[in-house]
Amino acid sequence: MTVLKEQPPRLLRGIPLASSGLRKTFGQREVLKGIELHIPAGQFVAIVGRSGCGKSTLLRLLAGLDQPTAGQLLAGAAPLEQAREETRLMFQDARLLPWKKVIDNVGLGLSGDWRPRALEALESVGLADRANEWPAALSGGQKQRVALARALIHQPRLLLLDEPLGALDALTRIEMQQLIERLWRQHGFTVLLVTHDVSEAVAVADRVILIEDGEVGLDLTVDLARPRARGSHRLAALESEVLNRVLSAPGAAPEPDPVAPLPTQLRWAH
C-alpha cells in the first residue's frame, strides 16, 4: 500500500493548542467554566465525560463552529482562527454526498489536478479500488474511511474527531482506531478525539482529559508504548482509573443544541 507523498515539514507538524479562561454559556447555563488547556504540537488527546459535560461544546469551539463567551483559543501564539485552513473535523456521520462518486467526495471543493491526490488519499485508507463507486455501496466503516481520506487530502495540522466511530461495530471500530493511529504517526498532526468510549480513549491517545460539569476533572498521561497490546494489565488499569472517575461524576443536562451551521461554514474534511 502506498501512502500520501511526503509534504514539506511545515505540513507534517501538528498545531500546538492552548485555551485560557475558556467559557461558554447558553442563556443562563454555563457549559464550559474557564477551561485551561495546553496541548503540544502533534499530541493525540482524547476528551471523555458524561453526556452534557461540555466536551462536544469544547470541540465546536476549537472547530470554529461556535464562539466562546469568554477566554482565548490559541494556535501557538496566534489566535486559533488563523489555523482554520489547516483544521479538519470528522463527525459520527461521514456526510458523503450520495450523488457524487467516492473519489469526487474526497476531492470536494478542490480545483486543478486533484484526482491523483484523491487516489493517493483513498489508497492511504485502503479504498483506492472503490474510487468510482457510489457512497451507497459502502459500509459504515468504509464511509468513515472516505471521510478520513477527504480530511487527509488537505494535509491538516489539526484533526478534530467528534465521535467518528460511534456507529460502527466493534471490529470495524478497532480497525478504524488502528488506521487513525497509523496515519497520525505518519503525518504528525495534532488530534483531539471526543468519545464516550473510555477503552478507545486509553487505547489510542497520548493523553485523556475528562470534562466534568464544564471543567477539567482529570488530565491523565497514557505513557504506554505503541502499538498497544489490548487487554494488557497496564492498559486495563488506566481504563479502570478513567472509567471509575467518569462514573463518580454527577450527570448533567444535555448540552444545548446549537444552530446548525450552513454547509459552507463547515470544514468537515472537505
Swiss-Prot record:
Disulfide-bonded cysteines: none
Gene that produces this protein: ssuB
GO cellular component, one term: plasma membrane
Protein known as: Aliphatic sulfonates import ATP-binding protein SsuB
Highest taxon of the lineage: Bacteria
Subunit structure: The complex is composed of two ATP-binding proteins (SsuB), two transmembrane proteins (SsuC) and a solute-binding protein (SsuA).
Keyword terms: ATP-binding, Cell inner membrane, Cell membrane, Membrane, Nucleotide-binding, Translocase, Transport
Family: Belongs to the ABC transporter superfamily. Aliphatic sulfonates importer (TC 3.A.1.17.2) family.
EC number of this enzyme: 7.6.2.14
Membrane topology annotation: Peripheral membrane protein
Enzyme kind, highest EC tier: translocase
Amino acids binding ATP: 49-56
